[in-house]
Design a protein with these regions (language model features):
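Short alpha-helical elements
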Residues: 2-196
């Protein structure tokens, strides 16, 4: 009897811990958003105006360009690939905390427009982390388009410029053949990616 009671207490404690950890993880999305927004504001000097937008004609949006970049980076840190899931489920809990939140369609359009701003912020953060390093190393990773068996039938990227078409290759570190592209990244000695 006491053994069954002890086991049931362990399971109830595990269930309570699991509930607390999932609530804590959900809370972290807004916390990460605020922290990433502060970092973006710190490194956006001379890139945006006082309201956090890239200077352009037209009405000033209430949800700033820096907030779009910060929300995009926050979703990346949480490994959220689906914008639908992010807006329909994850951000519903934080509507009170983020009052001027835009729709998913507007977010997608503005994220594409702010890609240059995001890239410039990434370069500034990388420069701050690495300093003025003079030595770099190149690392590469295969980006597989399709399986090797389907490579000859794959039409993706074959029209037009053949110098940019996917090709067969071998990855020595993974000891595998692949059909696709090879992504090269220029990294500093501390491991920060400078360009790709």
């Amino acid at each position: 009897m006491s053994k069954k009671l002890h086991i049931s207490l362990i399971f109830s404690n595990l269930a309570a811990i699991k509930t607390l950890s999932s609530n804590h993880r959900m809370y972290n999305l807004y916390t990460k958003f605020v922290k990433i927004l502060e970092i973006c504001k710190q490194f956006s000097e001379n890139l945006v105006n006082e309201s956090g937008n890239v200077p352009r004609r037209g009405p000033v949006p209430k949800f700033s360009d820096l907030e779009v970049v910060a929300l995009s980076l926050t979703a990346e840190t949480e490994s959220i690939d689906s914008e639908k899931w992010l807006f329909d489920y994850k951000l519903q809990e934080y509507k009170d905390c983020i009052p001027n939140l835009i729709s998913r369609r507007q977010f997608n359009d503005r994220r594409k427009k702010t890609a240059g701003l995001c890239e410039e912020l990434r370069k500034r953060v990388a420069m701050e982390m690495d300093g003025g390093e003079e030595q770099f190393f190149v690392d590469s990773k295969p980006i597989e388009v399709c399986r090797v068996a389907r490579g000859k039938r794959c039409k993706m990227g074959r029209t037009g410029d053949f110098s940019q078409a996917p090709d067969f290759g071998f990855c020595a570190s993974q000891n595998t053949y692949y059909f696709g592209y090879k992504l090269h990244a220029l990294c500093g000695l501390s491991g920060v990616i400078h360009s790709y």
